[in-house]
A protein has these predicted regions:
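Active-site acidic catalytic loop and adjacent metal/ATP-binding pocket
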Residues: 1-6, 10-13, 49, 135-182
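A short, glycine/Asx- and small/polar-enriched loop/turn
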Residues: 4-8, 59-64, 215
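A conserved alpha-helical element in kinase catalytic cores
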Residues: 14-61, 78-91
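ATP/Mg2+ or Mg2+-diphosphate-binding catalytic cores
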Residues: 16, 109, 113-125, 223-250
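Conserved short submotifs of the Hanks-type protein kinase catalytic core
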Residues: 61-73
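Conserved kinase catalytic-core helix
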Residues: 71-103
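Hydrophobic alpha-helical segments that form the core
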Residues: 110, 212-222
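Active-site Asp-x-Gly
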Residues: 160-210
């Protein structure tokens, strides 16, 4: 959840649904602040932490939050495939110089954390299907040191501002193969997969990319189910995604 603190040019990012699977969410928000501050100083096109307050996580009234520079909301639309692919390649180049090492595949931990919770939407058999898919797909990931990643580098996390696109929402930053970041966009049907990969340019293992795309879809399934607990409009999408896993289950 984000709150514009008008008239100050500051936006508060407040942890909401993430707390259900990330009890240590403050650590995730701090990693996001640290990385965004590094990228800002490196001249990368990112939404910067607010210079109005210290770049540290704040705890107030039982809420966990961080503070960011306000950017006027853009119009609807996504960047094109060439923009996404080339900007991700450039971002990865800068991220290779980041001295810290965030946890490997950090967002994947959300899936077993969700499946261990009391379910309000999915049945016990649904949980069995998703648990099996998670075990199978994570078993297909190649052991690799990887590099620092955005963590959730979908086209929706590029924001138009001042005639350029800016990366934001680094909360899921982690270490892993570049295929994990690419899959955030190539798994979507909104943009052309082949054009994104061509614009990215650097070699990517096709098998690992397919595995990461399936893990992205699995992650999307559990997040829609989580959102549906407080946003009923997300329920139908969660049900539709779950149906695709049941259909492909052995």
């Amino acid at each position: 959840m984000v709150v514009y603190l008008s008239p100050s040019p500051v936006v508060a990012k407040v942890a909401a649904s993430t707390l259900a699977v990330r009890p240590d969410d403050a650590a995730w928000l701090q990693r996001e602040l640290d990385l965004a501050l590094f990228l800002t100083r490196a001249g990368a096109p990112v939404v910067a932490p607010s210079p109005e307050v210290p770049a540290t996580v704040c705890h107030r009234g039982g809420h966990v939050m961080s503070f960011w520079t306000y950017i006027r909301p853009p119009g609807a639309g996504l960047p094109d495939e060439v923009t996404v692919g080339s900007m991700l390649r450039d971002l990865h180049a800068v991220l290779r110089t980041y001295p810290a090492r965030p946890p490997a595949f950090a967002p994947l931990g959300d899936i077993p954390a969700f499946l261990a919770r009391p379910q309000t939407l999915f049945t016990a058999d649904d949980v069995r299907v998703l648990t099996g898919a998670y075990a199978r797909l994570t078993g297909e990931l190649a052991p690799s040191a990887g590099q620092v990643l955005h963590g959730d580098a979908g086209a929706g996390n590029l924001m138009a501002a001042g005639g350029q696109w800016l990366w934001h929402d680094f909360e899921d930053t982690c270490t892993g193969p570049t295929a994990w970041d690419l899959a955030a966009t190539t798994a979507s049907r909104r943009l052309d997969r082949s054009r994104i990969l061509a614009a990215y340019g650097d070699p990517v293992d096709p098998g690992q990319l397919r595995t990461c795309e399936q893990l992205r879809r699995l992650s999307l399934t559990i997040w829609y189910a989580l959102y549906a607990e407080r946003l009923p409009e997300c329920r139908q999408r969660a049900v539709e995604l779950m149906a695709t896993w049941r259909a492909s289950s052995p």
